[in-house]
């Protein structure tokens, strides 16, 4: 009896630990511990067992302040952002628009979006421990996804692929976009068509190249290697596009330059427009342009830019819903498990930047 009393006294006197301390002891994120303790989706069974055992052993006590849900978000979402930068530090306006809308929609659902940047995997690990779910937006090494998987943090990858089951991929069908763009230009009579993308190691740019070449072959349009412009990371911006296109467009013989160019973003298309204006080419009379993203500015240009609309409201709602499901948002407990890959199908928005080269029918 005396021994039992002594044991009880020892447990009572032992200082309980909080979720942050337990995360540090186990080397996993606070978000993962929270999901494990609440039996939420997205936690490896072995990890869940480790967390529950540690909670019993160390006498875990929830932080009372963290329970005040009226004052704090129900879910913390870390948006890991790795954009391409312009020479002055500017960023693709299409990417910034997505982030702004994500923040607004998530806030309306008691979710907090934190935009995060990291230089190495150690920084990634440190930042990941402070959020419940991650969203990756930009260009990343595959090692980042392995790191997040090892931490047990569920993640959403926009325009990227992953082999890890805890990571959901939201993929715009850029292959379809390139194919549709070529079909439209071919219908207008264009047979000299160029393509401008970023590095082909990135999923969306690879899709653009594949769809572009496939469509050219279907229409028996020659594939001109020098018109397949793959911008390096440092030049994947408006000014880099302008510099890359000037040598292709500065020729006296119009048959030696493309009559139309397809771009993998509106930002790059603005660079093509700038190059054309610098050497005196008219859009669309001398050069037709098609962008991608449908940023607000594209409709205000003269002429307005033909582009692909990514349906941003639907895209933002999709990412928000997935974040809520993966992070265990109270309103998403009964939702079915999401698909591993979800495709977004952009639509071609025809405006004034593409000219028809076919002659008018004779009366």
List PLM regions with ranges.
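Alpha-helical recognition/docking segments in bacterial nutrient-uptake
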Residues: 1-5, 10-14, 76-183, 255
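N-terminal helix-turn-helix DNA-binding module of bacterial transcription factors
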Residues: 1-72, 363
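Short beta-strand segments enriched in small/hydrophobic residues
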Residues: 32-34, 69-89, 184, 192-199
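Hinge/beta->alpha junction and helix N-cap segments in small-molecule ligand-binding domains
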Residues: 84-96, 116-122, 170-180, 196-246, ...
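Short acidic capping loops at alpha-helix termini that bridge into adjacent secondary structure
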Residues: 191-192, 223-227, 283-289
């Amino acid at each position: 009896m005396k021994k039992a009393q002594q044991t009880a006294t020892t447990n009572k006197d032992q200082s309980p630990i909080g979720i942050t301390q337990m995360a540090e002891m186990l080397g996993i994120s606070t978000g993962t511990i929270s999901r494990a303790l609440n039996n939420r989706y997205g936690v490896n069974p072995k990890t869940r067992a480790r967390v529950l055992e540690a909670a019993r052993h160390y006498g875990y006590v929830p932080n009372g302040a963290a329970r005040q849900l009226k004052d704090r978000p129900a879910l913390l979402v870390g948006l890991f952002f790795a954009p391409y930068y312009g020479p002055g530090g500017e960023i693709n306006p299409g990417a910034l628009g997505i982030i702004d809308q994500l923040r607004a929609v998530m806030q309306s659902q008691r979710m907090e979006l934190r935009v995060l940047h990291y230089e190495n995997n150690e920084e990634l690990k440190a930042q990941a421990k402070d959020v419940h779910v991650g969203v990756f937006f930009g260009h990343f090494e595959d090692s980042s996804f392995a790191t997040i998987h090892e931490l047990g943090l569920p993640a959403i990858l926009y325009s990227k692929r992953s082999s890890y089951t805890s990571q959901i991929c939201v993929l715009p069908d850029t292959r379809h976009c390139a194919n549709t763009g070529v079909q439209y230009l071919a219908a207008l009579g264009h047979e000299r068509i160029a393509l401008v993308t970023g590095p082909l190691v990135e999923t969306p740019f690879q899709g653009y190249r594949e769809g572009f070449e496939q469509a050219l072959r279907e229409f028996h349009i020659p594939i001109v290697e020098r018109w397949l412009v793959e911008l390096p990371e440092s030049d994947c911006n408006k000014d880099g596009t302008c510099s890359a296109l000037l040598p292709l467009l500065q020729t006296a013989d119009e048959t030696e330059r493309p009559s139309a160019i397809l771009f993998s973003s509106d930002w790059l298309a603005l660079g093509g427009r700038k190059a054309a204006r610098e050497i005196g080419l008219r859009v669309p009379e001398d050069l037709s342009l098609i962008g991608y993203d449908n940023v607000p500015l594209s409709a205000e240009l003269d002429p307005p830019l033909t582009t692909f609309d990514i349906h941003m409201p639907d895209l933002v709602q999709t990412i928000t819903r997935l974040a809520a499901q993966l992070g265990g948002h109270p309103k998403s407990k009964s939702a079915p498990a999401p698909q591993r890959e979800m495709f977004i199908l952009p639509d071609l928005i025809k405006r004034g930047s593409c000219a028809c080269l076919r002659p008018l029918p004779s009366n």
